[in-house]
A protein has these predicted regions:
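Beta-sheet-rich non-transmembrane sensory/scaffold domains
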Residues: 1-441
Length: 441
């Protein structure tokens, strides 16, 4: 195997592209191209540090690579994040690599922070701090949107010019509002989905896009993520923060373990007046999926659906972890069901979103044909909570079903081996791949 490990795979016709990080993760990586008919190596292209995800443009002319550029553990080396654009119009042998970087935004850190972009690595410039995670491309192959998860922002990329044209902050979700409730504690051994004075950063992992009435919409799985390194960590439990008495007169009650005390928060944001205590509280991820305009405006969010639906469907397993059965409520203090993967598919004129829940497992299905009138369809989870998730030797019990869905792929009926639309899930913890046939009633 080339380099230090394969992070992402994409296929266009007979060409397979694989993103491979270097043995030294902070060094530049590469993309290897293979012939799908015999898996022979066709060629390679050098890209940025830690290529985390790649995708072909719909027309197959380019491969776009999200170079995450994470720092090393002591934060002594923090490579720049970037997007590599590999031009394949003249074949792999003549592939030309250009880089859409964030250098033009260096020196604008305070402006970006004021707009809501989280730039907070110790001493980091914009280029060093932004970590491209996932890419979606417009149907016309001209524009890409790239999520920077920890920064809670999207980058807009002009593919032909290989230029980042905008950085769009995604804002926060107010969990004190009706419809945005969450369960914030893993120490009450109960389902308690309620309103709290907390704002959740959307922080998507996977994103996808679709076109309706000549408008592109971005769909995000709002997983959430923090920075937690030996050299720098932003994580703190709310009970360990000093809360402003004016903003939180009931701080002592809020900070009890059974209330907000256990919820993971950040030390980076929330001290709005710089006096050393916290005037606002933030959490990681929104426990939902969202639809955004191409300009980054929120069009739809699923609110508290995921926790409410899983609580009703699996009341004894609510907010379980993905490697242990009988772990009721164990993820409530972190990111709840943790939506991570997303795929979109068109069936009989309707656009459906399939969202994988990394922790409790399963897939949420919504009809998003009208982004302003989204309809919940169903929740499917084949996990067997009645057996041990792990065998005595530490391996996954093959009887447990799927654990930790991460990657999702929709196969339309026209390309399906059985002529029916299919959904494929890659499940990280169980190491399983599952194919679901989608039946429309």
């Amino acid at each position: 195997l080339l380099g230090g490990g394969a992070n992402s795979v994409a296929v266009y016709k007979d060409l397979v592209a694989v993103a491979i990080e270097a043995s030294d993760p902070q060094a530049p990586g590469l993309v290897a191209f293979y012939d799908s008919t015999d898996l022979s190596l066709v060629g390679t292209a050098d890209v940025g540090a830690m290529p985390d995800m790649l995708t072909f443009t719909p027309n197959g002319r380019y491969v776009l690579v999200a170079n995450e550029g994470e720092p090393d553990d002591d934060y002594s080396i923090d490579p720049e994040g970037s997007i590599s654009i590999i031009d394949l119009r003249h074949g792999v042998a003549s592939a030309n690599v250009r880089t859409a970087d964030f250098n033009a935004w260096d020196g604008m850190e305070e402006t970006l922070r004021a707009a809501g972009v989280r730039i907070f690595g110790p001493g980091a410039s914009t280029s060093e701090d932004l970590e491209p995670e996932y890419i979606t491309v417009a149907n016309n192959s001209r524009t890409a949107w790239v999520v920077m998860q920890e920064a809670n922002a999207l980058a807009v990329v002009d593919i032909k010019r290989a230029t980042v044209t905008d950085i769009l902050p995604l804002g926060t979700k107010d969990h004190s509002l009706p419809g945005n409730e969450l369960d914030a504690s893993n120490r009450d051994d109960a389902i308690n989905i309620t309103s709290w004075p907390v704002k959740g950063y959307y922080m998507p992992d996977a994103i996808a896009s679709y076109n309706i009435d000549d408008e592109t919409y971005i769909v995000s799985a709002n997983e959430g993520d923090s920075r937690d390194y030996d050299g720098f960590s932003e994580e703190a439990r709310i009970k360990d923060l000093v809360l402003d008495p004016g903003a939180f007169p009931n701080a002592a009650t809020l900070q009890l373990d059974e209330n907000l005390g256990r919820l993971n928060s950040t030390t980076v944001n929330g001290d709005t007046d710089g006096d050393g205590d916290y005037d606002e509280l933030y959490s990681y991820g929104a426990r939902s999926f969202s639809i955004w305009s191409s300009e980054g405006e929120l069009v739809y969010d699923s609110g508290a659906d995921f926790e409410n639906i899983t609580a009703a469907a699996l009341p004894d397993e609510f907010n379980s972890n993905n490697d242990e059965n009988g772990s009721l409520d164990s993820r409530s203090d972190d990111k709840g069901p943790e939506p991570e993967g997303i795929a979109l598919g068109k069936i009989r004129g309707h656009i459906f979103a399939f969202i994988g829940l990394e922790r409790i497992g399963g897939v949420m299905v919504y009809d998003i044909t009208n982004p302003y009138n989204v309809q919940y369809i169903t929740y499917v989870n084949n996990r067997d909570f009645s057996v041990d998730a792990q065998l005595p030797n530490g391996t996954t019990n093959p009887l447990v079903g799927d654990l930790g869905p991460e990657g999702l792929v929709f196969i339309p009926a026209a390309k399906s081996p059985n002529g029916e639309p299919l959904l494929v899930t890659g499940n990280d913890v169980s190491g399983t791949t599952t194919v679901f046939q989608i039946n429309i009633e």
